[in-house]
């Protein structure tokens, strides 16, 4: 009964929507701050002269992958119910892309 959004009482419905919106905004702000932090870490890694490019390039690619996952999960609302079907296509596309990169890398290098 706690998940029911249409109780017939407008005040209860309004309070429920406000609470859900506040919770969603909190998640959005946390994800945004984490992405800004990851971007600053990437800039710091590039700017720090002691790191070689053999470390910096894979590190930045890892940070980029984490940011893409955050954006898909939070900003594209993949964390919400009812978004399983689009999420399946997105994750399937990522799997096909990784398979293609692996296949072409194998063909070119061997």
Swiss-Prot record:
EC top class, as a word: translocase
Assigned keywords, A-Z: Cell membrane, Membrane, Translocase, Transmembrane, Transmembrane helix
Source species of the chain: Bacillus sp. (strain PS3)
Family (UniProt): Belongs to the cytochrome c oxidase bacterial subunit 4 family.
Topology in membrane: Multi-pass membrane protein
GO molecular function per UniProt: cytochrome-c oxidase activity
Pfam families: COX4_pro (PF03626)
EC number: 7.1.1.9
Subcellular location: Cell membrane
NCBIfam families xrefs: CoxD_Bacillus
Classification via InterPro entries: Cyt_c_oxidase_su4_bacillaceae (IPR014257), Cyt_c_oxidase_su4_prok (IPR005171)
Predominant location category: membrane
Source domain of life: Bacteria
Gene Ontology CC terms, in alphabetical order: plasma membrane
Transmembrane segments: 29-49, 55-75, 89-109
Catalytic activity: 4 Fe(II)-[cytochrome c] + O2 + 8 H(+)(in) = 4 Fe(III)-[cytochrome c] + 2 H2O + 4 H(+)(out)
Protein name: Cytochrome c oxidase subunit 4B
């Amino acid at each position: 009964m706690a998940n029911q959004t249409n109780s017939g009482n407008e005040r209860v419905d309004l309070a429920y929507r406000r609470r859900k919106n506040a919770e969603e905004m909190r998640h959005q702000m946390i994800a945004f701050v984490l992405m800004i932090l990851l971007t600053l870490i990437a800039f710091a890694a590039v700017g720090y002269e002691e790191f070689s490019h053999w470390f910096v390039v894979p590190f930045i690619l890892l940070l980029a992958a984490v940011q893409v996952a955050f954006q898909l999960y939070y900003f594209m609302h993949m964390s919400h119910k009812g978004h399983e079907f689009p999420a399946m296509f997105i994750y399937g596309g990522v799997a096909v892309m990784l398979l293609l990169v692996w296949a072409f890398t194998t063909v070119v290098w061997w």
